[in-house]
Swiss-Prot record:
SMART domains: RRM
Cellular component terms (Gene Ontology): catalytic step 2 spliceosome; cytoplasm; intercellular bridge
RRM domain location: 796-870
Location of this chain's protein in the cell: Cytoplasm
Record-linked SUPFAM superfamilies: RNA-binding domain, RBD
Basic and acidic residues bias locations: 58-70
Modification Phosphoserine, positions: S249, S371, S374, S516, S683, S690
Name of the coding gene: Rbm44
Subunit relationships: Homodimer. Interacts with TEX14.
Pfam family membership, one: TTC3_9th
UniProt name for this protein: RNA-binding protein 44
Top-rank lineage group of the source organism: Eukaryota
Source organism of this protein record: Rattus norvegicus (Rat)
Keywords, alphabetical: Cytoplasm, Phosphoprotein, RNA-binding
Amino acid sequence: MQATAVVETDSDKSYHKNGGHLQNDKLYYPKKENMLFSNGCNRVKLTFPDGEGDSLTTDERTNVKENSSVDKRDLSELSFSETQDTNVENLFSQSSEFEDNIEYAFLNETYSIHYSESKLKDENILHLYSELDPEVHERVEVFFDTFGPQGNNDIGLGRSCEALGSACGDMQKSDVREDSQQEYHSAELECLSAHLAVDPAKTVSRSSLDVSEWRTSSYTFKCGGNLEVNRGKLESGPIPFLESLNGFSPKCSPQVSTSPSSDMLKEYHEPKYEKYKEQEVGLTYHKTFDDILQRSSSPLNSQKVPEPLVYAKEMKSQTIEGKDFYGDRIFQNRALQHPENAMFPQDHALETPLKALDAHQLSGPYVLDDSVISLCGSLQYNSLPEPGFYSPVMPRVAVTDSQAEVAGSCLHHVQGSATNKTCSLMKEMCLKSGPDAANCVALGQQTLDVSGRANVSSSVVSTASTTETKTVRRSQPEEWQRDRQSVACNTDWSCGQQCRSARAAALGSDSGRPLSTDCLNCGNSMDENSLELRKTPDKQRHPERAFQLCEEMALPSKCCEKTTERAVKAETHLLDVCYQMCHHHCHHIYKLVMGSRAGLSRNLPTDSAQKELGTALLSVLEDLKARYMNLKGKVHKGIPLEELPPLSVESKLLSAFSDFASRLMKEEACSLSGANSELDNQSLPEVAISPSLLKTLSQMSSISDSSHPKQDKLPMNNIFKNCDINIDFNHLKLNDKESKNVHEASEDWFDATERLTGTDFSVTQENITESEDWDPKNPLESELKTIERLRRGKGFLIHVGGLCPSVSEADLRSHFQKYQVSEISIYDSNTNYRYASLACAKNSNAKMAVKEMNGVEINGKSVNVRLVKIPGEYIPPLLSTAGNNISMNHLERNSSKDATSAASTCRLPIARSGQLESEQDSEFLPLVQGVRENCNQVKSGQSLPETPFQFIPPHTLNLRSFTKIMKRLAELHPEISRDHIIEALQEVRINHKGFLNGLSINTIVKMTSSFLRNAASRLK
């Protein structure tokens, strides 16, 4: 029977070849007249008329080769003949017509073939497995390929006829003798029985593949339509043609589509060959199945898959073909024995499983190009020129030492005579396919070397999205998988122990058993490596680039890690600062409240307040620490600090202390400068309990508050409440300049003719006696005691202030030697202010010292010298020393010419009427005892004022003269308020260089009255 192939390249032309003669005529098909396909695509029609069984002779094949030298021939067809027994009928019937949508990519390009569902036009089923005469083994089938691009009528097949003649010439030389064929029948039968599957559910149909080598000249073709134009150039030389397409069993791969030819065989043989099994020995034929066709709506169909180079080793072989019919399924086994030198050192078996989609169906038999082995329609093979003869043997894959690791194929490095080949590198990247084109599988198994039975399984799973290539060698299975690394997109060289176990079990039980779906899906985890795969060829040629690439890939992660660590460290430090601030705030509030506890203890017992306050503070600190540790842990976990709640503290103080600040401000803001109280000249306690004394005591209390918050301040606060004194704490601290001004502004408001020595000091003497029992432990109290002792012994004191640190007692004695200084005492303070007290025996010497030495420089620094005691006056030490310069400070502050500024300053209380005087006299007596108790509680030696305690002249305490002056001025200017009169007195003092000493009361009244009249005239 002779097979005739007709290829029609456009709508009106077809080329017919019969027996090697080319005819440019219209093909007439006796049964099917419609030879044209829709969509303007190229048509392929295969006819096998019955009764034509003559084979081509050698001369005819030579003629074919000569006639095929015509350039630009749009025809590629092969004729093959097989001798068949007369008993076999209808071996090949009319083939089916297909609507084809074909893409081809050639040499470094990809192609995909889309076939629509096959429409079987004939009821005669193609018999793939029929009984043939053993003599057919000497005849070799000829392959032919038909390229049909979509939407393009050009088929650039070049010199395909010439290639056909060359291939036929090689086939004639490589025919296998009948004698050599019969020798292997027995061995092949034994191998066939061993590899033949018994269980129909686990057996897959297999078709063996042969290799054909064509020597063709270079040509170029295009693919039209909506597909990308692909150009390929095929080099001259032998091209191995490997085909192995088998269908999986339903158990292994549920998505395997059944070939229409298999279904037809099932329908044809089911009534006739039920439970029938036969084996046919000694036939050589070429069977070509269609490749797995992808029909996916995804635009990712035209994806590119690795392109390995496959080389064939010419050798003689004999095949044993077996086919089984189990009810509704047909299984075929074929073994190929290699009597000559094999390419692998060990005998191996090659199996090529391919996974198919449910939506794709295998069409009827058609012919693929010999230079392309399509695994899932994406693999591409290229061959280099190699002399040799045609031999229908299995292809051999080999690599050189430099290319033992090849992308896209699992090629084993082999040492042998015929291994001087090179494997192709990855030329294209696998694109990620859609979900409907991800599981295309086909299984092809080939058995090598029946006698050895040492199997090497090379499983190639090629899909649009997953390509899994495995090679297992029995002697070194672990080493191979450990040394090989995937360099292709979605290519996994080692599927793990599970895949190896499944494959070993499949090979041990039956070589035809397909791999498990788990093994086929192992390559799905390689989608992320597509970026790295582009650089794999460079890594193979330049190993140093791989190390550089690793460093570059690791650099961003290290940089990000360091940046994150720095950010966490900075936020942790900021959180620590916030915690310390909150902690300090809690302690500050505690000290402040405890310092004022004495003033508030009139409503709360002291012990109860202290306990409750301490408990509240501990609770606040514990809660603060807990929230701090919680925030710190979250920061270490990577949560930004700005997204966390701020670290704050809430004061859980007692309700009794909650209004402490408001009450304190209220007491400070309270001013009773408009009081009309006047002190009587008959009451000595009026002089003793003067406002200056009260302010001095308040200064002492504030000093002790800042150093010892826990000390009681009850006497001080009682004085504040009972006397209603306006205390401005901001003016209790003086700098050196203010101190000098205070010393210079010693106010001697007294009448020169008035002497106060006749006054009874009985009450004050009692206080003096009690004050001698004090336990002075700070410099302030020591100074008071020293002054008291000096006053009693000498009676005349001189204050020398502003001493530099280098001034010693000897220096002062040398400067004040002519003034007959009997005793010198030097005092230091924390503010680097030093002063000295000098005792003079005579009043004249003291006055002369003040007049001459005031402003004199001692060791480079000028000093201010003032007189402390005036002759004829004896003031109790406590009262005289307690009268601080605070009263002078108040007068100094209120010396501003602006009348509005004077209203906000502290003012000295004015004596009221006689009734008020008697009331105050009764209140002042117990307050003096409170002052003594308060002074007894001063324990620390570190509680020194920022400025030293200044000695105030005793005339400041003589309020009787001040009362007289205010009374006279009020009588002269009744329309002027008391505040304005006091401001006028201050202005007079400032205009008189800050001193009113030596001026009589009448002079002071005249000067003040004149100032008031001038001010009133200016206002008008």
